Curated annotation (Swiss-Prot):
Disulfide bonds: none
Keywords from the named record: Ribonucleoprotein, Ribosomal protein, RNA-binding, rRNA-binding
Gene3D superfamilies: 30s Ribosomal Protein S19, Chain A (3.30.860.10)
Protein species of origin: Pyrobaculum arsenaticum (strain DSM 13514 / JCM 11321 / PZ6)
Keyword Cell cycle included in the entry's annotation: no
GO MF, one example: rRNA binding
Protein name: Small ribosomal subunit protein uS19
Domain of life according to the entry: Archaea
Length: 159
């Protein structure tokens, strides 16, 4: 019984979203709404938008914000440099950017309010927001109860 509690505590320390890094060899089995990654990459943006859930579809139909356009330019530049063998770090505050097929394979550092969290984009992230993978809060690890655990216990005389 205690071992399962210890395992749960260990999971809590890791965070409730554990980074599932799936190797590129397994990407061939990926399907998004019945389409392979290659089909998604070759698909025009209008057709891709039709595959997304309503919230993301509505957001992209309205057009990209200027910050999102800048981020896409950085991503395209990083892809070109990666083909030449150079590694470029992409840092962004755009937590509300929807992950598109052209972002797959890159590591984007997303700001969580304190630091930049590296997020490796796999095909399974398509359609989600960047901010979903860079949590802004820590999971609470409560201390042990006792003296000085609360404000009211500060005035109790220690023995």
């Amino acid at each position: 019984m205690s071992s399962s509690k210890e395992q749960e505590a260990q999971k809590g320390k890791q965070g409730w979203i554990t980074p599932a890094v799936i190797p590129p060899e397994e990407w061939a089995t990926f399907r998004y709404r019945g389409k392979t990654l290659e089909e998604l990459l070759n698909m025009p943006m209008d057709e891709f938008i039709k595959l997304l859930p309503a919230r993301q579809r509505r957001s992209l139909k309205r057009g990209l914000k200027p910050e999102h356009r800048k981020l896409l330019e950085k991503i395209r530049k990083a892809k070109r440099l990666a083909a030449q063998g150079k590694k470029v770090v992409i840092k962004t505050h755009c937590r509300d950017m929807i992950i598109l097929p052209e972002m797959v394979g890159l590591t984007i550092q997303v700001y969580n309010g304190i630091t930049y969290i590296p997020v490796y984009i796999s095909p399974w992230h398509i359609g989600h927001y960047l901010g979903e993978f860079a949590l802004t809060t820590k999971i609470v690890q409560h201390g042990e109860p006792g003296l000085k655990a609360t404000r009211s216990s500060l005035h109790i005389a220690a023995k």
